[in-house]
């Protein structure tokens, strides 16, 4: 897995808003003069529909190395730009929102957004390495979920044979175990112990999470955004991602994102590293489970 501009992680954040404020000075002025002064109306925030239109405008601007999500509660779009995005490209994004009520917040991320190829443990094909996300059952048969940008590489893997893959747009894939007895429903924590996974769920902003991957082991952090769109440049665009501040590096792609015994996501990509930190994106696992009719072991 190699970091590109916003790209997936295989080998397995948005922006300034101006507020119109009626200060106490207005009230003071009203008291000091005989005539009443009407307080200015508060600026209305963007609606869900307007936010969706603004998100589509950013998508059409097609700036590689950017990722963004909307906040209906604030009327904002939060956009994260990796180190490859120039000021001119950020201006292109801003211009795309000209006339929109959506407020843009821009954050910077170190390094490139890229997919990382290099249950957390390593799976390999040819010269590429990714990480296993979660072992699952499909009609009673043991399979493994990982990142789609990993399963796109080859049909034959160290643990079995690919039976499905979806990337770009999504980032999930599934491999049928050649040795079903080896399929463990737990996630390896890289300290000699394992975490039982008993269910799958949906992440929420602020949630404390952990990620397991074959390059950097077990790492912790929190969810910073949901339903993020990530432009990985030539690798493609993915939608509906979970955004976090958990670090990851090439080879962690496809690895497990979880909270306690709940499976949450599959490592897609990001920027930075585990020395200086980073921004990462994850395919929601519930979508992958639904696509393949699978359940966690």
UniProtKB/Swiss-Prot annotation:
It comes from the Bacteria. It holds the Pfam family Pro_Al_protease. One of its GO terms (biological process) is proteolysis. Its EC number is 3.4.21.80. It catalyses: Hydrolysis of proteins with specificity similar to chymotrypsin. GO terms for cellular component: extracellular region. InterPro entries: Pept_S1_alpha_lytic, Pept_S1A_streptogrisin, Peptidase_S1_PA, Peptidase_S1_PA_chymotrypsin, Trypsin_dom. Keywords: Disulfide bond, Hydrolase, Protease, Serine protease, Signal, Zymogen. The active site is at residues 149, 171, 253. GO terms for molecular function: serine-type endopeptidase activity. Residues 1-38 form the signal peptide. Disulfide bonds join 130-150, 247-274. Residues 39-115 form a propeptide. Has a primary specificity for large aliphatic or aromatic amino acids. Belongs to the peptidase S1 family. Monomer. This is Streptogrisin-A. It comes from Streptomyces griseus.
């Amino acid at each position: 897995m190699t970091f590109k501009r916003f790209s997936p992680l295989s080998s397995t954040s948005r922006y300034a808003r101006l507020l119109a404020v009626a200060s106490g000075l207005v009230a003071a002025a009203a008291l000091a003069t005989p005539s009443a002064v009407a307080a200015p109306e508060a600026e209305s925030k963007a609606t869900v529909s307007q936010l969706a239109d603004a998100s589509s405008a950013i998508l059409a601007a097609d700036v590689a190395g950017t990722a963004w999500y909307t906040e209906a509660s604030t009327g904002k779009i939060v956009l994260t730009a990796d180190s490859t995005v120039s000021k001119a490209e950020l201006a292109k994004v801003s211009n795309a929102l000209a006339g929109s009520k959506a407020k843009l917040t821009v954050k910077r991320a170190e390094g490139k957004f890229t997919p990382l190829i290099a249950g957390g443990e390593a799976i390999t094909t040819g010269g590429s390495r990714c990480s296993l996300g979660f072992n699952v059952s499909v009609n009673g048969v043991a399979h493994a979920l990982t990142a789609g940008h990993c399963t796109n590489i080859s049909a034959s893997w160290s643990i079995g044979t690919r039976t499905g893959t979806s990337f770009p747009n999504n980032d999930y894939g599934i491999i049928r175990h050649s040795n079903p007895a080896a399929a463990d429903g737990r996630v390896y924590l890289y300290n000699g112990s394992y975490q039982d996974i008993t269910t799958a769920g949906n992440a929420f902003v602020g949630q404390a999470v952990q990620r397991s991957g074959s390059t950097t082991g077990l790492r912790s952090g929190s969810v910073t955004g949901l339903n993020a769109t990530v432009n990985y440049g030539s690798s493609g665009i993915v939608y509906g991602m979970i955004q976090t501040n958990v670090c990851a590096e090439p080879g962690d792609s496809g690895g497990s994102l979880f909270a306690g015994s709940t499976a949450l996501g599959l490592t897609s990509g990001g920027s930075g590293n585990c020395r200086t930190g980073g921004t990462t994106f994850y395919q929601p696992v519930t979508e992958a489970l639904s696509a393949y009719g699978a359940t966690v072991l």
